[in-house]
């Protein structure tokens, strides 16, 4: 279920505006959590269509700046109906009827979260379009995304919750990302039989985990917060180099191979 709308406006091929909205419902969520409102807006200014551009239009054939900002939603959180618990039959051990048999019963393998709802992403895009000599077209864009409410399993819960062994999922994660997109296209018609077309693209992006339920970590370097998504953390941390045999003898023993003066000294 959903409702969508769009309004566009352009004035004299110079000033452009567009607004969109989506009001979407998803059966994946419990009643009261199913609907999300996701608006967006964009504006553009074609500077090269201004009258003051006439003197350089043969050289700079197109110049346009644009910006857009909006909110997007995601209801594909993995398993469907995350607000419902999943029960497996014959999984939980019971008591012995005799020495050779054991009772089995139902077991909750996933606790449903009635507050599960949409993941949301705030997206910003700022771009520039440049045309030179009616042959070379360059586009550059800078973009950011702030994704909140990422649906993930909690690491730990207090024993007072009574949910030992299986921790529930929740909209508890947050990731920020940013980057640039560049593209260039060159088209040249030499005559009716010969033409040249070249295209190049470049993309750079980075992301960072901002919020994640990690529980109590023994050391700060084991945390994924502040690192890119899927970064390897919690591994060995170098603490300099061994400078003498005396330092090796007085340091905790490293269990992964032989080492000597000049080798890496790992933090205990």
Q: Could you tell me what each predicted segment is?
A:
Residues 1, 260-268:
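Short, intrinsically disordered, charge-balanced linker/junction segments flanking boundaries
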Residues 1-236:
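Extracellular/periplasmic, surface-exposed regions of secreted and cell-surface proteins
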Residues 235-236, 241-243:
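C-terminal segments of large proteins
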Residues 243-245, 268:
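Alpha-helix N-cap recognition
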Residues 245-247, 254:
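Core catalytic ATP-binding domain of two-component histidine kinases
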Residues 250-252, 268:
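Acidic, glycine-anchored loop motifs typical of Ca2+
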């Amino acid at each position: 279920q959903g409702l969508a709308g769009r309004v566009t406006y352009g004035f004299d091929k110079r000033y452009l505006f567009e607004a969109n909205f989506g009001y979407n419902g998803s059966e994946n969520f419990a009643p009261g959590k199913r609907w999300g409102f996701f608006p967006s807006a964009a504006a553009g200014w074609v500077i090269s269509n201004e009258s003051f551009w006439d003197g350089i239009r043969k050289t700079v054939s197109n110049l346009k700046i644009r910006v857009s900002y909006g909110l997007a939603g995601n209801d594909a959180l993995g398993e469907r109906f995350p607000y419902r618990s999943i029960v497996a039959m014959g999984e939980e051990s019971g008591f012995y009827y005799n020495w050779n048999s054991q009772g089995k019963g139902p077991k909750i393998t996933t606790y449903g979260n009635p507050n599960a709802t949409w993941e949301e992403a705030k997206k910003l895009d700022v771009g520039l379009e440049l045309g030179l000599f009616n042959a070379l077209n360059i586009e550059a864009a800078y973009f950011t995304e702030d994704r909140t409410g990422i649906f993930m399993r909690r690491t730990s819960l207090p024993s007072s919750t009574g949910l030992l062994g299986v921790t529930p999922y929740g909209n508890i994660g947050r990731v920020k990302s940013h980057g640039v997109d560049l593209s260039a296209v060159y088209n040249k018609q030499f005559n009716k039989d010969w033409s040249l077309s070249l295209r190049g693209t470049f993309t750079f992006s980075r992301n960072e985990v901002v919020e994640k339920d990690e529980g109590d970590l023994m050391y700060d370097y084991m945390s994924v917060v502040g690192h890119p998504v899927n970064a390897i953390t919690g591994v060995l941390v170098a603490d300099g180099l061994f400078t003498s045999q005396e330092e090796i003898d007085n340091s905790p023993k490293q269990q992964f191979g032989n080492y000597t003066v000049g080798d890496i000294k790992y933090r205990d």
